[in-house]
UniProtKB/Swiss-Prot annotation:
GO terms for cellular component: ribonuclease P complex. The keyword Signal does not apply. PANTHER family: RIBONUCLEASE P PROTEIN COMPONENT. The keyword Acyltransferase does not apply. This is Ribonuclease P protein component. GO terms for molecular function: 3'-tRNA processing endoribonuclease activity; ribonuclease P activity; tRNA binding. It catalyses: Endonucleolytic cleavage of RNA, removing 5'-extranucleotides from tRNA precursor. It is an enzyme of class 3 (hydrolase). The gene is rnpA.
Amino acid sequence: MSIDMKKKHRIKKNDEFQAVFQKGKSNANRQFVVYQLDKEEQPNFRIGLSVSKKIGNAVVRNRIKRMVRQAITELKDEIASGKDFVIIARKPCAEMTYEEVKKSLIHVFKRSGMKRIKK
């Protein structure tokens, strides 16, 4: 499956990141911190990614971002719309496989009620 994070699904501007940090709610597990901000007027969700330089060099950070984007692409039908999310990767992500990243994201999304329940 290709990585397909269209422009409408991304947060890029610093002031948009800051709004989510300041006004949003956060949930975390050992691998990720996820901030969420409700935006009722928005027809879809948007994602912003942050991977600190403390985690590793550019190769490691970009690998983590690619895995998170791919997981979000696969989960996009299950993620609630009308919200902005900022996902911050923590140190343990550097050694994780794609399956572990996806499982961890599902865990933190379910924990905070951000993920739609599909039966």
